[in-house]
């Protein structure tokens, strides 16, 4: 069984008259959420979004919300006996996620499209659809926890650090959090999720996990960008910090901050890393590893989840995470407005890149205090 909140979902009425829309990607996580809720007697409605043309070149096997996954979600619904609907969100997804993804790379940034998808599609349009279906709440298969605090629902990291998805969900607003449920957040491991899937006889119990960037075939994001923005891979110069030309690159979109391999400028002594991208000059700037060291990070579009307003203090002591694969580090937030701040990392980080998220956590706690987008000018 899932944890106690799922037995009631926080509503003072029987499960049979509590409608829950489950966002079903076709993977094992959201399938288990739907199956557990259905088994507990809730009025479950499964919804899967078709986010792109799964017959076109952008689709790939094992990608979230592609043709196979829609089929798998439907099979789970049939197994558990609840209705399932497929909604065509291709245009919305392209406008809200894919176009910005391509434009960000053209601007020399390294975007995180999964965050934008949660923010602009799943927790916006799909959540509104759930309300239109008279649902009491919407449940997803994300590994994150929703806990009740003194001021209302709070967002907390998942119990399993290896599966925690809080970095990708920092932009969840208090209003959205009031309507959302995350039944898997308390589980200790993915093995528990698969065991629940097997217990329910779900056809996806052994299905491999999907890739993060669902619309990028084989991880070749540059190929996708070139299809969306012809001419995006114009070659240019690789230069060092003094401006000396060291070689030629294949297009700025092929490079990210901190990259060392694949530069094609070997034999120059000490290893060189990409420290900056200048798309206007079509330059890739490289330097020694110490040139990547960053302590001051400008952050904008902040979604603040603390109980007191962000600007109520001149400084906030937090733990900050500047990449999804890195652990949170000690930091100080210095607000500039309700949505902008300067974040000082107590210990420098390498490879801080525009387009990534900077997510804030309460010191000594699992609570997510919000986050924002890293902007140019990190130093």
From Swiss-Prot:
SUPFAM superfamilies per the UniProt record, alphabetical: Adenine nucleotide alpha hydrolases-like (SSF52402)
Active site: 117, 214
Chain segments carrying region Interaction with tRNA: 163-165
Catalysed reactions listed for this entry: S-sulfanyl-L-cysteinyl-[protein] + uridine(34) in tRNA + AH2 + ATP = 2-thiouridine(34) in tRNA + L-cysteinyl-[protein] + A + AMP + diphosphate + H(+)
Enzyme Commission numbers on file: 2.8.1.13
GO molecular function: ATP binding; tRNA binding; tRNA-uridine 2-sulfurtransferase activity
Family of the protein in this entry: Belongs to the MnmA/TRMU family.
CDD domains reported in the protein's UniProt record: MnmA_TRMU-like
Disulfide bonds: 117-214
A Gene Ontology cellular-component term: cytoplasm
UniProt GO BP: tRNA wobble position uridine thiolation
Primary localization: cytoplasm
Superkingdom as given in the UniProt entry: Bacteria
Protein name in the entry: tRNA-specific 2-thiouridylase MnmA
Transmembrane segments: none
The organism of origin for this protein: Cereibacter sphaeroides (strain ATCC 17023 / DSM 158 / JCM 6121 / CCUG 31486 / LMG 2827 / NBRC 12203 / NCIMB 8253 / ATH 2.4.1.)
NCBIfam families according to UniProt: PRK00143.1, trmU
Gene: mnmA
């Amino acid at each position: 069984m899932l944890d106690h909140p799922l037995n009631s979902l926080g509503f003072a009425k029987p499960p049979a008259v509590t409608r829950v829309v489950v966002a079903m990607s076709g993977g094992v996580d959201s399938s288990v959420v739907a199956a557990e809720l259905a088994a507990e007697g809730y009025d479950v409605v499964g919804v899967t979004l078709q986010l792109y043309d799964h017959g076109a070149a952008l689709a790939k096997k094992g990608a979230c919300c592609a043709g196979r996954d829609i089929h798998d979600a439907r099979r789970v619904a049939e197994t558990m006996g609840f209705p399932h609907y497929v909604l065509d969100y291709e245009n919305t997804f392209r406008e809200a996620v894919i176009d910005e993804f391509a434009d960000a790379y053209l601007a020399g940034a390294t975007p995180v499209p999964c965050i934008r998808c949660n923010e602009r599609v799943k927790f916006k349009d799909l959540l509104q659809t759930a309300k239109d279906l008279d649902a009491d709440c919407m449940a997803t298969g994300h590994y994150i926890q929703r806990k009740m605090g003194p001021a209302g629902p709070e967002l907390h990291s998942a119990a399993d650090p290896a599966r925690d998805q809080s970095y990708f969900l920092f932009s969840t607003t208090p209003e959205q959090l009031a309507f959302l449920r995350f039944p898997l957040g308390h589980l200790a491991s993915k093995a528990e999720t698969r065991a629940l899937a097997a217990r329910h006889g779900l056809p996806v119990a052994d299905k491999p996990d999907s890739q993060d960037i669902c619309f990028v075939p084989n991880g070749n994001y540059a190929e996708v960008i070139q299809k969306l923005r012809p001419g995006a891979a114009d070659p240019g110069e690789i230069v060092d910090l003094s401006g000396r030309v060291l070689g030629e690159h294949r297009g700025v979109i092929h490079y990210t901050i901190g990259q060392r391999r694949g530069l094609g400028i070997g034999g120059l002594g000490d290893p060189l890393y990409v420290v900056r991208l200048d798309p206007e000059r079509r330059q890739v700037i490289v330097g020694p590893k110490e040139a990547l060291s960053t302590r001051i990070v400008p952050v904008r579009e902040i979604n603040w989840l603390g109980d007191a307003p962000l600007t109520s203090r001149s400084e906030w002591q937090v733990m900050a995470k500047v990449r999804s694969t890195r652990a949170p580090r000690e930091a100080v937030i210095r607000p500039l407005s309700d949505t902008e701040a300067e974040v000082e990392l107590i210990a420098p980080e390498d490879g801080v890149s525009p387009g990534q998220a900077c997510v804030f956590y309460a010191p000594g706690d699992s609570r997510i205090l919000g986050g924002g987008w890293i902007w140019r000018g990190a130093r």
